Amino acid sequence: GWDVLPSGSLLAFMTIFRVIAALLMPALAQRGIDRRPLLSISLLAQTVGYIGLLTAPLQFPHLWVALIGFGLGACFALSLLLTLDHRRDPREAGQLAAFVQGVGFLINAISPWLTGWLRELTGSFVSAWMVLTVTVVAMLILTRVFSPATYRTGSMNMQFESR
């Protein structure tokens, strides 16, 4: 329910933080093989941002959208890295990345429709923010799956090929 200028300002603010995180995370991710801590930080940032929108949307709106934007940008960059971590063969890595991005974009294609439908149904964005919060928390739980022990390194592939 905001006017065009303030809402556009929030969108721009979110976009700035998305770009910063998307550029920063790959550099930070090079420091170690386990990407789960960075992924957890990015998902926690989103969770705090969505909870802020749910509980105090007018008190600190720039903080909430900055956290959400940072988390979204970081997650996108890290999702590209995680798919490459699991496959060292360029063809397999490309196939996995295409699958992950394809499914991700299909899921994201539903988000605007679902948000609009929930807003039309309830008269506010609160239910959409709840859905997003639950989704991000579920993703946070799933980060445990991305253990470096499951990564396929070049040396492991060579060991299997030599047998």
Task: Report the location of each language-model feature.
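Paired small-residue
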Residues: 60-68
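Structural signature of the two symmetry-related core transmembrane helices
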Residues: 37-52
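Intrinsic disorder in cytosolic terminal tails and internal cytosolic loops
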Residues: 146-163
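Juxtamembrane helix-start elements in MFS-like secondary transporters
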Residues: 2-11, 93, 97
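Helix-to-loop junctions at the C-terminal end of transmembrane segments
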Residues: 21-34
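Transmembrane alpha-helical segments of major facilitator superfamily
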Residues: 9-18, 100, 104, 135
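A late C-terminal transmembrane helix in Major Facilitator Superfamily
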Residues: 86-132
